[in-house]
Amino acid sequence: MDKLTAMATFVKVVDAGSFTRAADALGLPKARVSQRVSDLEKHLGVRLLNRTTRALSLTHDGSAYFDKCQVLLQQIDELEATLRGGTATPIGRLRVDSLITIARWVIAPRLHDFQARYPRIQLRLSSSDRISNLLEDGIDCTIRGGALKDSSMIARHLCDIQMGLYASPEYLASIGGVDSPNDLSQFRRLSWFSGRERNPFMWELESGPERFVVQSGDGMQFDEPDVAISACMAGSGICPGAPFAVAGFVRAGKLVPVLPQWHFSAAPVHVIYPGSRHLSVRVRCFVNWVMELFAENPEIQLTPIALALESGLAQRT
C-alpha cells in the first residue's frame, strides 16, 4: 500500500462527502477508492469512517487523523512547489479564528481581496469572543484582544480599540439624556460576557486622568457584542461598542454617542500564531495580508470622541 496515496484518497473522500464523488474527482472506479480507504484502516488498526447507506461521517480517530493528513499533504505540496519554482505557492486549508466584531466589520468585507490574491487557499473563518487554544482547537492563527498569555505564541500588533457608549435616539429622549457617568447606574445597560469563564464585561470608563467604574446592575447581557448593539438600536438601553463597528449606525442616525469624552481603556488587538521556524506559507500570507488590511484602514482606529465630533453629536462634555 502506498501510504501517501491512501492518505490523499482518504482526505478526498472526506472533502467530497462520499466515495462516489471522490471517485469522480480522482477519475477512479468507486471500488478502488473504497479499497484504498479500507486498506488504510486495516493498516492503522482503527476505523476512520462511519459508513451508512445515506452518509459518511468521521469517527473520533478519523477526525484526528484527517487533520494530520491535511497538514502533512499540504506541507508536501509546499515543499514540491518550492523546489520547482523557488517560491512556495500557498495552497490548502487555513483555519482562522477572530473576534466577532473584527470578523464581521473588518475581515469579511475584504475577503474577496484575499481570495483574489491566494485562490488556492481554502479559508475557514470562525468568529467567537472566547479564548481559543490554537493547538487543541486546530486553528492556524487567531485575532484576539488583550495581552498575550502564551509565550510559545507570536503576537503581531494590529490596532488598539477604544470603545465608547451608545444608545438609540428614542431611548435617550425617553430618559432625558445622560449628563455624567454618575447617571449611568440609573438607566438600562446592555453588555456582554465572553471567554471560557463567561465573565461579564466591566464598565470601567476613563476621560483623560479621570477614572469611573459603573456599578454592576440588572441590565441585559449577551454573548455577542453585535447582538447587544441590535438590541441597543431597538431602544433597549445603553451599550458599549467599537466606533468602527457602530460608525455606520451613528452616521445613519440609528445610534447616538453617550458621553463620548468617556471611553473604555484602549484594548490592543493582535494576530496570534504558533512560534515555529516552519510556519506554513498559508499562515504567513494571511498574517501579512491582515496586517496590511489594518494599516490601510484608518477607521479601525476611530475613537468615540472623533466619531461624535464627526457626526456633530459631541454636545455633552
Curated annotation (Swiss-Prot):
Q: Which Gene3D superfamilies match?
A: 3.40.190.290, Winged helix-like DNA-binding domain superfamily/Winged helix DNA-binding domain
Q: Tell me the Pfam families matching this sequence.
A: HTH_1, LysR_substrate
Q: Where is the HTH lysR-type domain?
A: 1-59
Q: Which cysteines are joined by disulfide bonds?
A: none
Residues in the DNA-binding region annotation = 19-38
Q: Which keywords fit this entry according to its UniProt record?
A: DNA-binding, Repressor, Transcription, Transcription regulation
**Protein family (similarity comment):** Belongs to the LysR transcriptional regulatory family.
The entry's function note states: Represses the transcription of the operon that consists of PA14_22510 to PA14_22540.
This protein is called what? HTH-type transcriptional repressor PA14_22550
Native organism: Pseudomonas aeruginosa (strain UCBPP-PA14)
